[in-house]
Amino acid sequence: MYIENFLLLASALFCIGIYGLLTSRNIVRVLMCLELCLNAININFIAFSNFIDYEKINGQVIAIFIMTIAAAEAAIGLALVLTIYRNRETVDIENFDLLKG
């Protein structure tokens, strides 16, 4: 396999994720698109690590670190969405005006 294939896949996933972030009004869908972007970044790190130097595992270590951060972000994000849904009964981003002033 060539590195171009992995980079093409990662860029397609990243573009789909950014499109979803910019156009979606559902907060759960926004979190899913953010996870898609993070997975595209992981593909890039692993592909570059594999094709540049076979001996070192720096790309894999960074990818595991990003997966850990993404899992924590997803858990906290979904907990916040669930709490806001219980109070507001909606998951629409436009209705998240929780600041009073």
Curated annotation (Swiss-Prot):
Keyword Transcription regulation on entry: no
Q: Which reaction does it catalyse?
A: a plastoquinone + NADH + (n+1) H(+)(in) = a plastoquinol + NAD(+) + n H(+)(out); a plastoquinone + NADPH + (n+1) H(+)(in) = a plastoquinol + NADP(+) + n H(+)(out)
Transmembrane stretches in the record are: 2-22, 32-52, 61-81
Stored InterPro entries: NADH_UbQ_OxRdtase_chain4L/K, NUOK/Mnh_C1-like
For this protein, the record's Gene3D superfamilies field holds: 1.10.287.3510
State any single GO MF term. Answer: oxidoreductase activity, acting on NAD(P)H, quinone or similar compound as acceptor
**Subunit structure, briefly?**
NDH is composed of at least 16 different subunits, 5 of which are encoded in the nucleus.
The entry's family comment says:
Belongs to the complex I subunit 4L family.
- Protein name, as recorded: NAD(P)H-quinone oxidoreductase subunit 4L, chloroplastic
Q: What is the lineage of its organism?
A: Eukaryota, Viridiplantae, Streptophyta, Mesostigmatophyceae, Mesostigmatales
| Gene name of the encoded protein | ndhE
